[in-house]
């Protein structure tokens, strides 16, 4: 895991800036399907996130066109021991990258993995790539600015990290 901070303007009318903190997670799966990676819809509630809503989005990647990702929105009480809760809004983008495949869909990943193991003897060794970003009035980061910054970082990182010539897209 890594944290990435870059200053971005809050508004066109105000000269001040605020950091947009993007948390980057890259997890590689093992050979054992039973102990392999899963999706954040399972992990985030265990970390205190609630009100999860998900959509499929298209994100441009520098020099490689558009990729589909799952985008989740969630809320988290960051003061659980206090009588007055402070609720933080977050967005989470994720995608699974295999030996020859990329998908934003957990079920598609599972079916591809089973088919490739049975028919071709290929273990995809999936990589799970996720970027999470907090936003909202409480931290003075508008949702649209957080989205732009997050998608820009996705583009920058995936354009360098993925072996694009090996993917069947």
Task: Go through the PLM ranges and name each one.
Residues 114-169:
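Long, compositionally biased interface segments
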Residues 1-119:
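Short, solvent-exposed recognition patches
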């Amino acid at each position: 895991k890594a944290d990435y901070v870059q200053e971005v303007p809050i508004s066109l009318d105000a000269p001040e800036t605020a950091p947009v903190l993007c948390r980057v997670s890259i997890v590689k799966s093992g050979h054992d399907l039973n102990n392999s990676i899963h999706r954040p819809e399972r992990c985030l509630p265990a970390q205190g996130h609630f009100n999860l809503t998900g959509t499929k989005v298209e994100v441009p990647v520098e020099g490689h066109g558009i990729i589909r990702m799952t985008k989740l929105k969630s809320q988290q009480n960051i003061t659980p021991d206090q009588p007055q809760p402070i609720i933080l809004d977050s967005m989470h983008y994720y995608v699974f990258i295999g030996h020859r495949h990329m998908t934003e869909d957990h079920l598609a990943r599972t079916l591809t993995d089973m088919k490739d193991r049975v028919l071709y003897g290929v273990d995809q060794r999936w990589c799970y790539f996720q970027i999470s970003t907090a936003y909202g009035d409480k931290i003075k980061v508008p949702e649209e600015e957080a989205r732009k910054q997050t998608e820009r970082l996705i583009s920058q990182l995936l354009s360098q990290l993925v072996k694009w010539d090996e993917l069947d897209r």
